[in-house]
Amino acid sequence: MHRLMGVNSTAAAAAGQPNVSCTCNCKRSLFQSMEITELEFVQIIIIVVVMMVMVVVITCLLSHYKLSARSFISRHSQGRRREDALSSEGCLWPSESTVSGNGIPEPQVYAPPRPTDRLAVPPFAQRERFHRFQPTYPYLQHEIDLPPTISLSDGEEPPPYQGPCTLQLRDPEQQLELNRESVRAPPNRTIFDSDLMDSARLGGPCPPSSNSGISATCYGSGGRMEGPPPTYSEVIGHYPGSSFQHQQSSGPPSLLEGTRLHHTHIAPLESAAIWSKEKDKQKGHPL
């Protein structure tokens, strides 16, 4: 009996074990399924939120670009209307010319039609655009505000070299004095062979301080000229071409006479000096 009771108890215990384990597994599966469903719900919510944010961003971008495109189109249309208004007001461009009955070509003027929706443009903007797009020559030559070109001299040039300037910057007397002083001889002194001969004959050369500012033709000895030298205008005349050569060939009579006297006076002295040099050469180098 006890054995049978033990067997029954063990069988009952064995039969009762699967029921207990089954209840425990069911509870665990329920917890796992609940966690899985919660995770899926959170993922779905996150996906929905991201999609909504994307939609909002896309709509904002589209609206922004649409507004910018509208503003660009409106600006372009306003610019075209403004150009049409300006061309209808002032820009009358000459087109192909037609020959009239007399044979004289007559230019045809093209005037574009005035638009109905004209915009109010300030006059300075119209003038600026008109000057920018229209050629300056020969249509607007009278409207170019350029100063006149005047060639001004400083008044220091002698008469043959003055340009086409008619503006008198100084008094006539002052101008004549400037012209006379501007052609004076330089302060240095030109020395010729005749001066050396005269100085040797008269007893030595003169100090250079006594001859400073005076040219070689201004001495009073030996039939030379005295006083200041002739002015540049007197020498060259009004035409610096052939008249200068003619005056140079003719020259003042006193100057020519003085040079002739010097040449006739120097000729025998030069011949004597040459003869003495040849004699010395023959003595030093015998053949």
Curated annotation (Swiss-Prot):
Transmembrane segments: 41-63
Positions on the Lumenal side per record topology: 1-40
MF annotations from Gene Ontology: protein sequestering activity; R-SMAD binding; WW domain binding
Induction of its expression: Up-regulated by androgen and TGF-beta (at protein level).
Alphabetic keyword roster: Endosome, Golgi apparatus, Membrane, Repeat, Signal transduction inhibitor, Transmembrane, Transmembrane helix, Ubl conjugation pathway
Disordered: annotated span: 239-258
Compartments reported by the entry: Early endosome membrane; Golgi apparatus membrane
Record membrane topology: Single-pass membrane protein
Main location: membrane
Cytoplasmic domain ranges by topology: 64-287
Expressed in which tissues: Highest expression in prostate. Also expressed in ovary.
Assembly with partners or alone: Interacts with NEDD4 (via PPxY motifs). Interacts with AR. Interacts with LDLRAD4. Interacts (via the SMAD interaction motif) with SMAD2 and SMAD3.
Notes on the domains: The PPxY motifs mediate interaction with NEDD4. The SMAD interaction motif is required for interaction with SMAD2 and SMAD3 and the negative regulation of TGF-beta signaling.
Protein name: Protein TMEPAI
Species annotation: Homo sapiens
